[in-house]
């Protein structure tokens, strides 16, 4: 019996770091060159394109509610996350997508989105070294 594709949803938002999307996307693409079967889908909370931290518009394949079944959720980071609260719409989107994923991960400051969604409670997590103390204060459990 052959396993089907491993579906990965990447949650993006305005101000996200483009590297936090392109880096993991390249890793999954390289894995596919060596026989893996990863399928990437870019998701924003409402399905709208988002503007990255460098001003580039990133289209979303769909919104969080309509996202297809997936195995892994990856939440990208953004420079503003450590310094300001995560919006409730983004937090709700992360929570909804995480509830349907077998594995949840974040890149860099994306951990702040997971924390705001209550997804770090009782778990160990890390973020960019400059923001570990802030993450620990915001997500003490």
Swiss-Prot record:
InterPro entries associated with the record: Class_I_gatase-like (IPR029062), DJ-1/PfpI (IPR002818), INH-QAR (IPR052158)
Alphabetized SUPFAM superfamilies for the sequence: Class I glutamine amidotransferase-like (SSF52317)
Protein name: Uncharacterized protein in cpoL 5'region
Similarity field: Belongs to the peptidase C56 family.
Signal peptide extent: none
A GO biological process held by the record: regulation of DNA-templated transcription
């Amino acid at each position: 019996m052959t396993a089907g594709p491993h579906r990965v949803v990447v949650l993006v938002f305005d101000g996200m770091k483009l590297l936090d999307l392109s880096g993991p996307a390249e890793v999954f693409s390289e894995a596919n060159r060596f026989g893996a079967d990863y399928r990437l889908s870019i998701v924003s909370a409402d399905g709208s394109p988002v503007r990255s931290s460098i001003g580039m518009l990133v289209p979303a394949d769909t919104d969080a509610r309509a996202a297809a079944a997936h195995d892994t959720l990856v939440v990208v980071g953004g420079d503003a996350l450590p310094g300001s609260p995560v919006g409730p719409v983004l937090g709700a989107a992360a929570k909804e997508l995480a509830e349907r994923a077998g594995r949840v991960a974040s890149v860099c400051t994306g951990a702040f989105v997971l924390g705001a969604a209550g997804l770090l409670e009782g778990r160990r997590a890390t973020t960019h070294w400059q923001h570990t103390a802030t993450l620990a204060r915001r997500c003490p459990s």
